[in-house]
Amino acid sequence: MAKRGYEVVTTVRSEDKAAKIREAHPGAKLTVALVPDISRPDAFDEVVRAHGQGLEYVQHTASPFHYGWTDAKTELLDPALEGTRSVLRAVQRHAPSVRRVVVTSSFAAILSAAGIADPTKTFSEADWNPLTYEDGLRSGPDNKADAYRASKTVAERAAWDFVKDGGASFELATICPPMVFGPVAHHLPSLAAINTSNARFVDLVQGKWAAAIPPSGVFLWVDVRDVALAHANAMERPAAAGKRFFVTAGYYSNREIAAAVRKHFPELKDKLPDESVPGGDYPEGGVYKYDNSRATEVLGIDWIPLEKSAVDTVKSLRALGA
């Protein structure tokens, strides 16, 4: 957004992150504020009150995505749900000039367990994950993904309910990406801090796929640069108001990712799986379908292809020491 000429106020949870972001964007019209705990009901009141005069747009992108949790309520569900509610309440109370809020949701709020097992199913913005907050609380070690999926679903539903029931003075749009690949931020402190989606690339270049390629996951992906573009255009374009956007470039498999990296990084040959290594392919019965036409047309996205995204991701990881 700074590149588009906006004056940006962003929030982080620690002063260490704030310093890294300031250092990474010298000369930008940028203010970095601290919000240590987004699950507090008044988490964003102070920063919105301080900067709300003249504020036009808000993007809420913060929500935990990982499967290493021990308490789904405090680590996933409440930060996602209360974080979303607290942003919207703060805007409503303290920033009457805000025209639109864009919330980062997820394909997790669209998919269903039955749907992803059905190759005849076509997912679009019309679909909602049936998981509830209570389902998320019941998640255990054998189904950790359900807690994350529930957290994104209830958070996005809360955003739409707020606009519908609370007489909001602003418009809403939501962005629903699946797995997000692409170059990592150069202010990332170390490979240990890599996001969940890109962790597969770290494992790949460190030789962890050499003997067997792991299962791919949900088979739909998008490049982080297209996700950023989707947020910017959903914020600015009149036709985006009041809409969900299923933001995906299409299919991927871990086998395709390995092949792209093997093609472009011959110097990593000894760490990469060769063509005979098993695993990481599409299911024999096929994969569910998707409809990304709304995002393509309304947001005007020319999707970055998988091979380019994979190459750019590995380049950025190698710069961090991978």
Where are these regions (language model features)?
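Glycine-rich Rossmann NAD(P)(H)-binding loop
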Residues: 214-217, 245-252, 283, 299
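Glycine/proline-rich active-site loop of Rossmann-fold NAD(P)-dependent oxidoreductases
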Residues: 168-169, 182-198, 233-245
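Conserved C-terminal active-site "lid" loop/helix of NAD(P)H-dependent oxidoreductases
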Residues: 279-300
